[in-house]
């Protein structure tokens, strides 16, 4: 049972990195226990945490009960409060049994309401093929009185005597909830039959709606009231007559929908104020919002709190195995452990562990245009019509036979002609370009920060006091058209600058969240039955020996904490809630015969064979506040000895995306997207510029053999100031920092720039997530070049942004650039004035071009190791660390230089420490714990 010590960098157990206890601990174990471990290795293998099925023993077993591998414990006490659900169990481990705490799990049933903001699909489910401006058959009454009737009369009937009411009366009397049928039309093909318009009557169904209401067909819904599909129980019939009132032309069936018409998944994008009297606007589907439990049920169990979120103790000792530490990393440790044990991109059904991820094309905009292909056309269904405007009039022609050198006789009988001149009439549709632009607008522009959006006309969040974290608000904000479009960084592989600091995991293309949402079904209301693992004990299998124990946990009920949404809206404000109806504990027992079990119990009762379990990251975490606009952070750590210290890992978090530490219910947490602090969805690593580590000693650390000065780690360097060429990989990361990350991830430093031999797939490692980028663009310091793209919206209630019309591109073929991008096409065809060409003979000159470089490194913690495996640190001992640091007390100052951000953030620091809990069970019903931690002892704040 080798002592595997977690490495902070990739959370991979690596023996050579830990110098405290040596490479193994077998020397401390009794010979009998070593033999037992060898014989039963499959029970205890860390990388086989969820073990293969083991056949229960058949000999030396006296009762059938002893062969059962899994037993259900019902709670002896529950406490259901508005914000939490507490369960307490009395766990009885019988004689000859050994309970594996690491493999136990909670079996939970309940009812979940994901709230009205839940929308697990894109587009609309109601008339999705209707044009966005299309109006359904409407009957509108307004003051005056004035009645406006608009629509199609699609049902026909035989009406040979037009001044006779009989045929029309029959149609009026047949009007019902299904007659006339809105799904039927005349049923005539234009070329197959030409109806005699004097012998037919027409009937249509019309909806009476509010004059000020929405009338568009796209997204319109009225619920049925009968099993035949009728949507109203009452129909009002009207007769359709000619202007003289003598000829019966047809009938209308009018149903009143003023109270029943709804738009469940769409919203009206109103035109700008100046056009509101002459433009009815266009429809837009509400944004998709997948909502499900978090990856591995993060935050469902109340972890990491100083108020004793979990309790495991025995009858005779009140000590709690669940050590109360607010800086533990239970959730994040579990993420890293799974990533090291298996692929995070498989086995999604287990423990809800569909990992958060994002579509790379959304994060890094690879704008290689579109595949043009040959022209694509749309044709009339019958394939006939006037193809040319200038041609002979063929409407009243006669056809003659062929005679002698001239026409013959006119063709006998009735001859009907429908002839047109020219090619088949058509409309060209650039499907590839339109599809590409749709992707850009719905996947990138829609997720721009709110400061690059403006409100549609009629929506005033300030006056109406609408919280910007609500789903209602998000659907009524539209992006500036020019920030990202088909021409943005054309030809480059470059993330949209305005999107770099936006959480890419809060997206409907987060496949893991989408899976977890779909696992619960497609209704906002669902009954769930889930299995939640015991993360606290999952690292080491804490084996409970025979006795009676009290086990207690608190389950959260805050929807923002336990649920995750792709939009990150405030689920509490949007009406989501959860009710637990049953929480049982499923306990797993070792399938061993009595002799083996008794021998194991005797050995584990021995104090020399105590069990240990540890936080997998082996780290103490701390959050340091960085105010909005700040670029500097200083961390002062009081003097202490640094034995057991393995290094620093750090990244950056948004304050709005980080709940209050240790809070069971954080009132100010109005966010439900990914929580990087808990789930590892880091995405702000690129905002660090440099880091320095200074000890109060004359010895430089980590030495002078790196490219840059001692104590300073320059993470990135602007291209303009990199005259020495210290950056690499076509980005602004320094060679020195690249070396440090290669060292801490793959133990490759002086081996050169090469790949590591390990074939294991790491989810959270450096090279997998390192994404360098470069591009060129116009130098707008040149007075002859003009930056036409404005990214600052004007705050008004007109629904228009005139600055966007500076750009002319696709004029006449899209909505006006100053209008919301979802409105209808306007304008005239015109030569484009943007972007400046960077290719071909017309490219702007080289002295007008500037180079841009940057990188992203999501899902990753920057790491600086403090170990002999890193680099020179002065005189080393066999413990692998300079005695100046390990044997003497020194204070430390860490300085960060960061990119400014327009909101409050935290620097998230993980200090690699020796952190272990030792558990001893000397006799029945006794649990004794000893807690070891260095260099940061329990409760010490940095």
From Swiss-Prot:
Keyword Phosphoprotein: yes
Source superkingdom: Viruses
Molecular function GO labels: structural molecule activity
GO annotations of cellular component type: host cell; host cell nucleus; T=25 icosahedral viral capsid
Swiss-Prot/TrEMBL induction comment: Expressed in the late phase of the viral replicative cycle.
A family per Pfam: Adeno_hexon
Main location: virion
Family: Belongs to the adenoviridae hexon protein family.
Function: Major capsid protein that self-associates to form 240 hexon trimers, each in the shape of a hexagon, building most of the pseudo T=25 capsid. Assembled into trimeric units with the help of the chaperone shutoff protein. Transported by pre-protein VI to the nucleus where it associates with other structural proteins to form an empty capsid. Might be involved, through its interaction with host dyneins, in the intracellular microtubule-dependent transport of incoming viral capsid to the nucleus.
Comment field (misc): All late proteins expressed from the major late promoter are produced by alternative splicing and alternative polyadenylation of the same gene giving rise to non-overlapping ORFs. A leader sequence is present in the N-terminus of all these mRNAs and is recognized by the viral shutoff protein to provide expression although conventional translation via ribosome scanning from the cap has been shut off in the host cell.
Oligomer and partners: Homotrimer. Interacts with the capsid vertex protein; this interaction binds the peripentonal hexons to the neighboring penton base. Interacts with the hexon-linking protein; this interaction tethers the hexons surrounding the penton to those situated in the central plate of the facet. Interacts with the hexon-interlacing protein; this interaction lashes the hexons together. Interacts with host dyneins DYNC1LI1 and DYNC1I2; this interaction might be involved in intracellular microtubule-dependent transport of incoming viral capsid.
Protein name: Hexon protein
The species this protein was found in: Fowl adenovirus A serotype 1 (strain CELO / Phelps)
Originating gene: L3
């Amino acid at each position: 049972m080798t002592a595997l010590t977690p490495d902070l960098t990739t959370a991979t157990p690596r023996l050579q990195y830990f110098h405290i206890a040596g490479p193994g601990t077998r020397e401390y174990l009794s010979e009998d226990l070593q033999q037992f471990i060898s014989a039963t290795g499959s029970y205890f293998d860390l990388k086989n945490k969820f073990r293969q099925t083991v056949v229960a023993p058949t000999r030396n077993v006296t009762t059938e009960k002893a062969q059962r591998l899994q037993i259900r414990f019902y709670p002896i006490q529950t406490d259901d409060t508005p914000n939490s659900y507490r369960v307490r169990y009395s766990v009885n481990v019988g004689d000859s049994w050994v309970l594996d705490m690491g493999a136990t799990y909670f079996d939970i049933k309940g009812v979940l309401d994901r709230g009205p903001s839940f929308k697990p699909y894109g587009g609309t489910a109601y008339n999705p093929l209707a044009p966005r401006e299309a109006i359904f058959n409407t009957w509108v009454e307004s003051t005056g009185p004035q009645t406006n009737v608009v629509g199609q009369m699609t049902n026909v009937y035989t009406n040979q005597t037009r001044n006779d009411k009989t045929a029309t009366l029959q149609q009026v009397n047949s009007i019902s909830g299904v007659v006339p049928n809105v799904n039927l039309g005349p049923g005539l093909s234009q070329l197959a039959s030409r109806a005699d318009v004097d012998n037919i009557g027409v009937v249509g169904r019309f909806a009476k709606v509010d004059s000020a209401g929405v009338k568009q067909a796209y997204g319109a819904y009225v619920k049925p009231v009968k099993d035949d599909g009728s949507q109203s129980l009452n129909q009002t019939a009207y007769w359709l007559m000619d202007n003289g009132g003598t000829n019966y032309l047809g009938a209308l069936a009018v149903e009143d929908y003023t109270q029943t018409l709804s738009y469940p998944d769409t919203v009206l994008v109103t035109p700008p104020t100046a056009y509101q009297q002459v433009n009815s606007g266009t429809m837009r589907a509400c944004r998709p919002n997948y909502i499900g439990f978090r990856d591995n049920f993060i935050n469902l169990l109340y972890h990491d709190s100083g108020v004793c979120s979990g309790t495991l103790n025995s009858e005779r000792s009140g000590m709690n195995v669940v050590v109360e530490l607010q800086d533990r990393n239970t959730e994040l440790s579990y993420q890293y452990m799974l990533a090291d044990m298996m692929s995070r991109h498989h086995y999604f059904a287990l423990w809800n562990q569909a990992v958060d991820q994002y579509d790379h094309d959304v994060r890094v905009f690879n704008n290689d245009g579109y595949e043009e292909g040959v022209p694509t056309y749309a044709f009339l269904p019958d394939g006939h019509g006037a193809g040319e405007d200038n041609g002979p009039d063929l409407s009243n022609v006669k056809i003659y036979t062929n005679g002698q050198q001239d026409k013959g006789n006119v063709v006998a009988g009735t001859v009907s002609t429908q002839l047109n001149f020219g090619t088949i009439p058509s409309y060209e549709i650039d499907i590839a370009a339109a599809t590409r632009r749709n992707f850009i607008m719905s996947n990138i522009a829609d997720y721009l920060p709110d400061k690059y959006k403006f409100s549609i006309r009629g929506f005033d969040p300030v006056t109406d006091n609408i919280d910007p974290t609500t789903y209602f608000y998000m659907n009524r904000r539209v992006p500036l058209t020019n920030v990202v479009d088909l021409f943005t960084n054309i030809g480059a592989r470059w993330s949209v600058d305005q999107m770099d600091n936006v959480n890419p995991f809060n997206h409907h293309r987060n496949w893991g969240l989408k899976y977890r949402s779909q696992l619960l079904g497609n209704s906002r209301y669902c009954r769930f039955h889930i299995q939640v693992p015991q993360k606290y004990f999952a690292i080491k299998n804490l084996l409970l020996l025979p006795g009676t124990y009290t086990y207690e946990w608190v389950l959260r009920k805050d929807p923002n904490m336990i649920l995750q949404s792709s939009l990150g809206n405030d689920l509490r404000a949007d009406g989501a809630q959860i009710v637990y109806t049953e929480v049982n504990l499923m306990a797993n027992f070792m399938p061993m015969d009595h002799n083996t079990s008794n021998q194991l119990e005797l050995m584990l009762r021995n104090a020399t064979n105590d069990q240990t379990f540890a936080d997998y990251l082996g780290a103490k975490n701390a959050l340091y506040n960085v105010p909005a606009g700040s670029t500097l952070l200083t961390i002062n750590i009081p003097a202490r000895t640094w034995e057991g210290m393995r290094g620093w890992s750090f990244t950056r978090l948004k304050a709005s995306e980080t709940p209050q530490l240790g809070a069971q219910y954080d009132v100010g947490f109005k966010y439900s997207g990914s929580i990087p602090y808990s789930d590892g969805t880091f995405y702000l690593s690129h905002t660090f510029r440099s880091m320095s580590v200074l000890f109060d000693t004359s010895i430089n650390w980590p030495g002078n053999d790196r490219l840059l000065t001692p104590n300073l780690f320059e993470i990135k360097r602007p291209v303009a100031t990199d005259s020495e060429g210290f950056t690499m990989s076509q980005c602004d990361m320094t060679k020195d920092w690249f070396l440090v990350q290669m060292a801490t991830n793959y133990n490759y430093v002086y081996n050169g720039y090469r790949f590591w031999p390990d074939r294991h797939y790491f989810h959270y490692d450096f090279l997998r997530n390192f994404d360098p980028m470069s591009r060129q663009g116009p130098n707008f310091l040149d007075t002859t070049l003009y930056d036409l793209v404005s990214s600052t919206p004007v705050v008004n209630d007109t629904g228009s942004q005139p600055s966007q019309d500076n750009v002319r591109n696709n004029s006449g073929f899209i909505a006006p650039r100053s209008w919301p991008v979802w409105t209808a096409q306007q304008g005239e065809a015109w030569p484009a004035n943007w972007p400046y060409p960077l290719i071909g003979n017309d490219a702007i000159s080289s002295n007008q071009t500037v180079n841009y470089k940057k990188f992203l490194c999501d899902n990753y913690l920057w790491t600086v190791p403090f170990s002999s495996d890193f680099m020179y640190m002065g005189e080393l001992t066999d413990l692998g660390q300079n005695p100046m640091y390990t044997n003497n007390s020194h204070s430390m100052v860490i300085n960060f230089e960061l990119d400014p951000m327009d909101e409050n953030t935290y620097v998230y620091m993980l200090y690699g420490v020796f952190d272990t809990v030792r558990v001893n069970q000397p006799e029945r019903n006794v649990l004794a714990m000893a807690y070891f931690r260095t260099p940061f002892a329990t409760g010490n704040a940095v």
